[in-house]
Amino acid sequence: MPAGEAEARAVQDTLRSRVVLDEPGPPPGTGRVTGVDVAYDDERDVVVAAAVVLDGATFEVVAETTAVGRVTFPYVPGLLAFREIPTVLAALESLPVDPGLVICDGYGRAHPRRFGLASHLGVLTGLPVIGVAKNPFTFSYEQPGPRRGDWSPLLDGEEEVGRALRTQDGVKPVFVSVGHRTGLDNACAHTLLLARDFRQPETTRRADSLCRKALREAAA
């Protein structure tokens, strides 16, 4: 774990060169898809991570696991991965099956140093990973059209770092970015398929519910 902010940024800059951006990634509706998410108990400096593996075609749960860890890095925007990565890795490593494509509640390329949680996790595991976030972080975008599937580029200046994707008619968009070993078109296609009933992908919804439940149990 980095000793401070400067060291953490140096780690990001070093690992960023290992991100693979020229693979399309697994096709939607096939294989397995895994949602990862975390929940915090700030008073006790505890973080709980959950990983939920779904069948990519049926959305049935194939496997799920949780891990409990200590928060050992301060809250610094742009460096949140260092608070989450150790516990998320522990959850993924305890899965009894290959996770397939991993979906993070966060960012990949849509990050000031182009190395958010989804990219960090992808480089460390070698897995294809995408980020699907609830807000645009520091980036700009125009509202996509009102219909499900409409999208607009998420921009840092003139560089497209992700997309604002409307997953439900008339509902706020989510913000999709590539993490590792997956293209942006494919990342959006996966997100849209997984968000068939709600704004958030089913993977994220399941992982969020599981980590919150595990945090309550850990605090009991």
What residues fall within each predicted segment?
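C-terminal binding/interaction regions
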Residues: M1-D22, I85, K134-N135, Q143-A220
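Flexible, glycine/proline-enriched loop segments at strand-loop-helix junctions
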Residues: P74-L79, C104-P112, V171-V178
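Short hydrophobic alpha-helical runs that function as membrane-insertion/retention elements
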Residues: P128-A133
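Two-metal-ion RNase H-like nuclease active-site motif
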Residues: G31-D41
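Feature detects long, helix-prone N-terminal segments enriched in hydrophobes
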Residues: V102, T138, E142-Q143
